[in-house]
C-alpha cells in the first residue's frame, strides 16, 4: 500500500491580500487598504493543505528560502497534516516567493515575486517519494522555470 494518497510537487509561497483599495490605482501615491491578510498561497500548497485537512495522506515537495516566509509557509502546511520532510530549504540570495493580491470591489491585481518558485529543479525532487502514492499532482508548471524542461520525464515515472 502506498505511503500517501497524494504526492504533490510545485510552488510554495504565501499570499498577502490587501482589501478595500480604491478602484483607480494612481501612480506615485500611497494608497490605504482597509484590511489585509497573510495566508498560504500557491495552487500546489493550497491543494496539499486542503486535501490533508479533509483527511488525505499528502506528501509535498517544493523549495523555499531560509527566511520568515519560507518558515511560515512550511508551518501552515505542517499544521494541516501535510508531510513536508522533502521540501528543500535553500540558503541563498533568492528568498521564498510571495504573491500580493490587490483586491478591489469587482476585480483584483495579482503580483508575484517568483523567488524560489522558479528555482525548483529536478535535483530537488525525490522520485521514489513522489511515486509512493495513489495519485501524483503537479501544478503551476509555467512558474517552474528550472523544472519545466524535464516535466515530461517526471510524469511517466510517477505512476504508482
Where are these regions (language model features)?
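Glycine-rich phosphate/adenosyl-contacting loop at the front of the ribokinase-like
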Residues: 1-63, 68-82
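Short acidic/glycine-enriched loop/turn segments that link adjacent beta-strands
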Residues: 94-96
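Conserved beta-strand and immediately adjacent loop positions that scaffold enzyme active sites
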Residues: 99
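Ribokinase/PfkB-type carbohydrate-kinase core domain
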Residues: 1-14, 76-89, 102-160
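Proline- and acidic/polar-enriched loop/turn elements at helix boundaries
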Residues: 63, 89-90
Amino acid at each position: 500500500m502506498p505511503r500517501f494518497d497524494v504526492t504533490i510537487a510545485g510552488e510554495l509561497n504565501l499570499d498577502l491580500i490587501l482589501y478595500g483599495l480604491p478602484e483607480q490605482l494612481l501612480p506615485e501615491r500611497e494608497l490605504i487598504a482597509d484590511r489585509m491578510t497573510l495566508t498560504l498561497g500557491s495552487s500546489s500548497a493550497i491543494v496539499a493543505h486542503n486535501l490533508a485537512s479533509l483527511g488525505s495522506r499528502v506528501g509535498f515537495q517544493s523549495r523555499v528560502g531560509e527566511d520568515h516566509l519560507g518558515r511560515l509557509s512550511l508551518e501552515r502546511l505542517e499544521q494541516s497534516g501535510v508531510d513536508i520532510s522533502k521540501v528543500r530549504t535553500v540558503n541563498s540570495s533568492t528568498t521564498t516567493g510571495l504573491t500580493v493580491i490587490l483586491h478591489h470591489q469587482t476585480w483584483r491585481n495579482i503580483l508575484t515575486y517568483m523567488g524560489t518558485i522558479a528555482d525548483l529543479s529536478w535535483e530537488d525532487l525525490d522520485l521514489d517519494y513522489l511515486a509512493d502514492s495513489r495519485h501524483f499532482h503537479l501544478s503551476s508548471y509555467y512558474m517552474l522555470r528550472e523544472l519545466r524542461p524535464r516535466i515530461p520525464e517526471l510524469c511517466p515515472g510517477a505512476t504508482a
